[in-house]
Structure formats: C-alpha cells, structure tokens
Amino acid sequence: MQQITLTQPDDWHLHFRDNDMLLETVPATARTFKRAIVMPNLVPPVVNAELASAYRDRILAARPQGSEFEPLMTLFLTNTTSIDDIRAAKKAGVVAAKLYPAGATTNSDAAVKGIEALFPVFAEMAEQGMLLLIHGEVTESHVDIFDREKLFIEQFLVKIVNQFPQLKVVLEHITTSDAVDFVSASSHNVAATITPQHLLLNRNDLLVGGVRPHNFCLPVLKRSTHQQALRKAVATGSSKFFLGTDSAPHEKSAKESACGCAGCYSAWSALELYAQVFEELDALDKLEGFASHHGADFYGLPRNTKQVTLVKEEWTIPEVITLPNGEPIVPFFAGQTVNWALKA
C-alpha cells in the first residue's frame, strides 16, 4: 500500500505547555489533528473554568493563520475541587477532568492525595456528562516504578469504575498488559489512550547501551511483553483503545541533565509513527478507527468530516527543533527514518 486516506484524526491526550512554548506546540499539533484534549498540568494548574477559558484563548491565539484546530479543555482535580467547580467548568465547555495522583508526573504536586474524598465530585461529573481522565499510577515511595500502573488498577480504578458505572473513564497512556486486560473486560464506559512511544519502545530502549533521556516518559516504558500486549490491543481494532500521543515537550537541557524531565515530544511525527506501527502489525485497516473514530465516539463528539492522506515516503525526523525562545528541543525519534509522510 502506497497511500492511506483517513478521516482527520484527533489527539485525545497531549501537553501544550504555555506562553511562548505554544508558538511551537500548537502549530505542530494543528498540522495533523483537528482537535486535542489539552492537559491541565500548568504552573499554576488549570483548576477552574476561568483558568481553562483563559488557557484556551492563549492556545487559539497560537494557531497558524487559517487553522480550524480546536482545543478541548480539561480541569485539574485537587482535594479542594468542588461540585460547583465541575458545574461551572461544564458550563464553560470543559469536556473532562484529569485525576493525577500527587507526584505522578510533571507539575502534579497539587494533585490528589486521597481519591475517595473526590467521590462526590465523580458523582457530579457522571451527572454532568464530564469524562474522568486518569493518570493511573500509585506514587507511594516504596512501590516499584514498574508496578505503579498495575497497583493503581487494583487499589483504585476497580473501585472507581464499580462505584460510578455511568461515569465515562479514560485510563490514559496505558503501558501494561494489566491495563489492556482491565479496559477490555470493563463496561463500554471505560476506554484507554495509547502513545506512540509505548507501541514502538520498551524499557530496553531506555536503558540498554546507556540511558536515553529522550525516551524517558511517565508512565515509564515497560518490558517487551507489555509492549506486545499494547500492540496486540490496537491491532484488534477494539473501539476501547484510541490515539493519545501524550506529546510532552521539554527543552533539551531539561531532558539531558542529572535529573531529567519525563516526556516525549512527538507532535511532529505522531500520526506517521502510528502508521508505521500499524503497518508492522499488518493492521493498517485499523488505523482510521484508532486515530479518527474511537475517541470521538467515546467522547460523544461528531467525527471529523475532512480527511488527511499519508503517503509511503521515507523522511528523517529532525535531530533538533529550535523553540521560539531560541532553546533547542529534541523531538521523539530524532534522527530516525519514518516510512510514512503526511501529504501536504
């Protein structure tokens, strides 16, 4: 196959950051995607409707001229989030709220320390039709980092799903066979996003032959058996799994340091890399559902009407991109050859 035409895809999980970084990240995503679920872990975090609306305005201002890209805003849940916050956010057009266990990812220190305390908020979200997006890891210091996702499912996610069967839940950026099995066995109100890095890589790609900081993300890459479970899941074409890049930019100096930041900046190549994975799996016929249909259907939003075309054409991802502030950023898969290209 030399060409694939798809309904224009959406990215159901990414990080734009803020301020002048938006001048890089927003055009990178708008190049391919019609809509994106924008994570709220700024400093300070996006904890209410007013902050979400202001952030949306900053994103819209960074769109390329003529772009129809639409940011879909989210709320950052904290222990002080109230039912009124949820109602106001829904009224302002916020589509989802994000649950971060405290310390689980970049800028999550303000996040939730006692999940059961938020049950009244979850009940209101179900009532309002607002989705719950979950970074599914426990963060206690004694827990092995490779076991965080499995234990979160066992200790918290089962309880949330059983307690609130009408609440739509997305387990974000899943990394384990445990997550695949849980989502597959759960009701139609439970789904998951999967990143390109977790389909393409496993922990050997992070640690063998030297530490590779630009492959470091959270949740951390797992062993090959978990990677294969993710690949098998997307190859089935199940509507429970859909595209969420978790594209997360950090300046080169923040990644290449004694305590490097987590995140892979994949916006410039994500769809092409997903296509490469689906081709390897002999499942290119399943790519459109994963990239363009399943997420919109789960969110209860209309599918996009425009199309994009990928052509079989080799190109090399740049070694570095210069940010608006002049600092370099290393994109995901920098310097590597990709077999599919987005047709202009």
Swiss-Prot record:
Enzyme type, top EC level: hydrolase
What residues does Zn(2+) 1 bind to? 13, 15, 98, 246
Pathway, according to UniProt?
Pyrimidine metabolism; UMP biosynthesis via de novo pathway; (S)-dihydroorotate from bicarbonate: step 3/3
Instruction: Recite the UniProt keywords alphabetically.
Output: Hydrolase, Metal-binding, Pyrimidine biosynthesis, Zinc
GO molecular function, one example?
dihydroorotase activity
Residues where Zn(2+) 2 binds? 98, 135, 173
Gene Ontology BP term (one) = 'de novo' UMP biosynthetic process
Cysteines engaged in disulfide bonds, as pairs: none
Q: Which GO terms describe its cellular component?
A: cytoplasm
Q: Which residues carry this modification: N6-carboxylysine?
A: 98
Protein family (similarity comment): Belongs to the metallo-dependent hydrolases superfamily. DHOase family. Class II DHOase subfamily.
**Its biological function?**
Catalyzes the reversible cyclization of carbamoyl aspartate to dihydroorotate.
- NCBIfam families in the cross-refs: pyrC_dimer
Q: State the name under which the record lists this protein.
A: Dihydroorotase
Report the source organism: Pseudoalteromonas atlantica (strain T6c / ATCC BAA-1087)
Q: Which gene encodes it?
A: pyrC
